[in-house]
């Protein structure tokens, strides 16, 4: 099933998707999603964060897990249907605010610069201009020592502009140009995860990160993850 509701801008109609199924990716039940959330949590460098922005919250399952380690979270999504579902899911979590805000739009509701930004399985649904604007937006609004978590399903999702691998490698390069280094890398046959920060030690485990000695090799094709 194709989900483009505007062939000119090629924007997926996620509201229609959620209307057919309130959990179309089985986020609340699938092992892939539960495992991914656990790995995201394990990859966070700090035990607690002051302020977070989840820039594609979906139905709010990851936000619910993050809420145990963040003082205040703004969760946004491009789909009004997803926002409604997430609002219900997170109703008993008073330090979480859910709002409609599509990338690369600057979100309202950020009381302070977030020290954690999460962009999970969103980038490949944006066109090239919107992806570039998203990288610039994150660089602009994140706190100086913020952590940015990027997660992409590795293959090419239906109705996506690029594959997860392509989006991840593009984002890594764009962030590096802005002074963000990768401090955590996870790559397997299902998804890619990276934690990026401008607060990167010059020497990590004997590697000179300041001079580009990066031992964290990411696959350049899906076959490399097998």
Where do the protein language model's features map onto the residues?
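Hydrophobic adenine-recognition pocket in adenosine-nucleotide-binding enzymes
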Residues: 122
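Class I (Rossmann-like) S-adenosyl-L-methionine-dependent methyltransferase catalytic domain
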Residues: 1-55, 59-110, 126-140, 146-226
